[in-house]
Amino acid sequence: MREGRLYIDNRDAYIDFGVWITRGGYDGLLPFPELVEPDRNDWPDEDGIEPDLEKPTLKPRELNITFVRDVDGRSAGDLVEHLSKSGYHLFRIPSLGREWSLRLIQSPAYEDWDTLEAFTLRFAEDQPVRPSSVAIPEGRAYVPPSEYELDGVPLDRYGVMVTEGRDEIMRSPTVKTNLSRTVLDVDGRIYDAGKVVYNSKEVTLKCCLIAGSMTTFWSCYDALLDALIQPGERSLYVDYNVEEYPCYYKRTSGWKLESLRGRVVVTFNLTLEFTVFRMDGVDYLLATEAGELVVTEDGEYYIDLNIYA
């Protein structure tokens, strides 16, 4: 049954235009908006960067939706003609429980499947929707305790487990280039090797969000996006190496809706920019006999036991 799966401007897409969305066609609707790259100071003699995150802003989104129609049915031109009318068009998908206001920016690329024809349209979402007043959910019912915390909140609270990330976390950043000079009649170059400092680095975590219902999924989805785009730097704590990294959200990619039946399962990649990263030895922090780190009375800082000359 293809009726009632997609509504465009409150019109049933199958009944009125003879089209439906192909399997996997929902994936393009899911990615978080990308963050506009913030202004930054990149001091040549200091590790990392100082980004201006006082007021993070989001980029408009562009996305593809692939439709299918019967070759013997109505022409795809009916849908394209409707979407070519001025203004935005409201896409509502009942099974996802959400709607999007989109603008057509590219007409179809066609692909024949015997008795079916697939065509892909590209849309813009000019004003991505920011979540507002989102409480942190208890989405951990279907995922194990997380080794990662975002601003002190374990990712399993958002229903998220990180399936790959250790190699990305431990990968060393590139070294900043110091002052150098070449002389025409001298081999090689003269390089200031007096100090080694590191660039910031991008880290991509492969994630899986699992929820018991679409309502819970959107609650976790909105809460995670809201947490990522708050003003200021984020803090990513990694349990397996007892390190906390200053960072900020950049983008997501590779969203795939794996399951809508029973549990909702979605996989995606989360990319963060680590503003400062240096692996320069062992840090010693005060802990209890049970291995729990001791924090200061205000709950903001660990107690450093390193000896500094």
Regions found by a protein language model. Name each.
Residues 1-309:
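Extracellular/virion structural assembly segments
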